[in-house]
């Protein structure tokens, strides 16, 4: 299982960081239990709650044919007070 695809940085997700809530896109086939276990194991934190929603795919025109991109799942992960996840941003030099 690949788990988390990447962290999401939107206006809403940055606002939620103040509430100790982290937003990320995850594999669409994974369950909440798998993601919770993976986050607690990998980052060493305690997850209090998880909210998820599935975002629809967008339409893409490929010549005369209209196709759709794959949908994906976004999770909002709430941690216990005192725990935090380090930033998932790589520095470019």
From Swiss-Prot:
InterPro entries: Nucleotide-bd_a/b_plait_sf, Ribosomal_uL23-like, Ribosomal_uL23/eL15/eS24_sf, Ribosomal_uL23_CS. It comes from the Eukaryota. It is found in: Plastid, Chloroplast. SUPFAM superfamilies: Ribosomal proteins S24e, L23 and L15e. Gene3D superfamilies: 3.30.70.330. One of its GO terms (biological process) is translation. The keyword Magnesium does not apply. Pfam families: Ribosomal_L23. GO terms for cellular component: chloroplast; ribonucleoprotein complex; ribosome. The keyword rRNA-binding applies. GO terms for molecular function: rRNA binding; structural constituent of ribosome. Keywords: Chloroplast, Plastid, Ribonucleoprotein, Ribosomal protein, RNA-binding, rRNA-binding. Binds to 23S rRNA. Part of the 50S ribosomal subunit. Belongs to the universal ribosomal protein uL23 family. This is Large ribosomal subunit protein uL23cz/uL23cy. It comes from Nymphaea alba. The gene is rpl23-A.
